[in-house]
């Protein structure tokens, strides 16, 4: 069985639980590597919306993502994964959908990854 190495390119630890119902010690923690993959954001002053200032934002290239390394899977944010549009099969994002484990509204663990 192929066992890849995971490198977390987000700014925070990712906990993937193994147990289907709750967070316990049977999960795997992927600590932040210290390197962060991001999507460049371009911002421009937009029109006013009533009394509120608006900013027009568009996204550009992915930054901080290493070249593929055989046997390595990179964990990135959903925004980075979306910007890659399927071009990198070695890149995944935490599955933060409705099955993620939350505490006080904050995600504490995910059950897997989105590819």
Tell me what each language-model feature is.
Residues 1-115:
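Intrinsically disordered, low-complexity segments enriched in small/polar residues
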